[in-house]
Amino acid sequence: MGFEASYDVIVVGGGHAGTEAALASARAGARTLLLTHNIETIGQMSCNPAIGGIGKGHLVKEIDALGGLMARAADRGGIHFRTLNSRKGPAVRATRAQADRVRYKAAVRSVVENTPHLFLFQQAVDDLIVEGERVAGVITQTGLRFRSPAVVLTVGTFLGGRIHVGEVQHAGGRAGDPPSIALAARLRELAPRVGRLKTGTPPRIDGRSIDYAQLTEQPGDAPRPVFSFIGARDEHPPQVSCWIARTTEHTHAIIRGALHRSPMYSGAIEGVGPRYCPSIEDKVVRFADKDSHQVFIEPEGLDTHEVYPNGISTSLPFDVQFELVRSIPGFEQAHITRPGYAIEYDYFDPRDLKPSLETRCLAGLFFAGQINGTTGYEEAAAQGLVAGLNAARSVRDLAPWCPRRDEAYIGVLIDDLITRGTAEPYRMFTSRAEYRLMLREDNADLRLTPLGRDMGLVDDARWAAFCTKREAVERETQRLAATRLDPERVDREAAERVIGGAFSREQNLLDLLRRPEVDYAALMGLEGAGPGVEDPRVAEQVEIGAKYAGYIQRQQDEVARQQRHENLALPEGLDYAAITGLSMEVRQKLAAHRPHTLGQAARIPGVTPAAVSLLLVHVKRQGGNGPQSPRPDDGRARA
């Protein structure tokens, strides 16, 4: 008999989903094996060198609050930080960092290699070991057998991956890496619903060949935001600027003249591409009225001259890529170091997943990342953390965990996927969350770190830092409520300048801070008001808590109303045809989706409020009143 070894959890893939899955599993106490086809590519940024953005930054903060790695790696590798939507309300503000690819990957690798209970092995996986109706391990390309009752697949674009550059195409998982053909075929045998998606990347440019005098500089923010709740600015490497270029009508004419050579328009690519990150061909066709598109010039790192021209992702032939790049002002002498390409790959309908991200087709098998139809490092990492955690919990016979929609963007992401599915690469936006005022970046730790601590994900150092911050916020809020300003005892003119109006009666500082025009730092400058807190993150929490208290309370009341029936479990084998009053359309949709809870049923397109009421009555009559799954504080998962 050949080689065989056993682990509690096996994670296949070392990208953003895989590393978070393996780390979460190991932190939760499971003896975890991370299998990757190449250890040198662990944590690699396969597409653009950036972390965060609108909606995505919220996911990164939540991963961090649960003890994950992405935010810390972004702080250690980030060379350009910005807060997006900084002039808008706190619900939609988002952190984004350009990362040095080498430094980011090194930060990930360092943590992975130094995490207890986590083991690495370099080998591609070709098959699953299946015993009855559950997974029992994996078989590698050389026949090595690794056994485990829980396997997490985080295989990115590698399943049946095919790379396209113009009329030329070849098998590949990404540039320079082979695809997973045997594993893709095996999964197609097991999973009932499979499709093809597509993504792409732009040509890379030697920055020395660009005329920056024709571009617009985009410096980072000062002061810089910090991604991790336990991060600091002194961790950041030296900072650099990004730049903005623009395509021209000549650029668009070149593209239109070569569309017949594009695999997207010739029919060579069957996969659907990301709606919110279209190729330059798509932009020119879909937005024919626009005579110019922005191109963001993003540095790849401090020790390389390569730049990433974000905005001209393309699968056009290389000669066309060369011509269109040189038609952009400032790029007349540009030297392309790597061609752009499109890649299409298999994904599996996420409606065939449980909220834990365990598949319905095979017990113990979990999916995370692009295999579930998502796009983006952040979406992948969030799924990886949940899948890895639940894989570890499953082998200890603990209840699975998934945050609700009102608890986290991670909950919104997973609920959207398993309830609605997706026919195109799914990207997170703040607009997808109905409770976004409660789900801000700044309070992700307050929302999730206690839960992470209960489940063993949060270490002592992070927990101590969290408790210190939480106590400081509570202490300062109480101080502001107890401190009163008397108009007779302060500089009236200075006070009215700070509060933006007349100051004629005694008020406490918390009430004054609730006024939209009042700034915390300015308020603390008034005689008798300070000194305030020095930590800007504590000050931000205090100010947002004061200003939005009424709105947040209303949203919490709405959540409470929804929660009365949101988590009501629907029996696994519920016969929708037997429920009197449901239309044929609703019965078909419920049978196709098989929702886990009444809340999920209500979010299926075409399921009416009346149908939800009928479902509720039916389940109540059958004696159903339990939640979808126990919370992690049910006493069985203490750290």
Curated annotation (Swiss-Prot):
Quaternary structure note: Homodimer. Heterotetramer of two MnmE and two MnmG subunits.
A matching Pfam family: GIDA_C_1st
Function: NAD-binding protein involved in the addition of a carboxymethylaminomethyl (cmnm) group at the wobble position (U34) of certain tRNAs, forming tRNA-cmnm(5)s(2)U34.
Cofactor: FAD
Annotated stretches, region: Disordered: 620-639
InterPro entries: FAD/NAD-bd_sf, GIDA_C_N, MnmG, MnmG-rel, MnmG-rel_CS, MnmG_C, MnmG_C_subdom, MnmG_C_subdom_sf
Localization: Cytoplasm
Gene Ontology BP terms: tRNA methylation; tRNA wobble uridine modification
Organism listed in the record: Thioalkalivibrio sulfidiphilus (strain HL-EbGR7)
Keyword field: Cytoplasm, FAD, Flavoprotein, NAD, tRNA processing
GO cellular component: cytosol
Protein name, per record: tRNA uridine 5-carboxymethylaminomethyl modification enzyme MnmG
Gene Ontology molecular-function annotations: flavin adenine dinucleotide binding
Lineage start: Bacteria, Pseudomonadati, Pseudomonadota, Gammaproteobacteria, Chromatiales
Alphabetized HAMAP family for the sequence: MnmG_GidA
Gene designation per UniProt: mnmG
Family: Belongs to the MnmG family.
Annotated NAD(+) binding sites: 273-287
Sequence positions that bind FAD: G13, G14, G15, H16, A17, G18, V125, S180, Q370
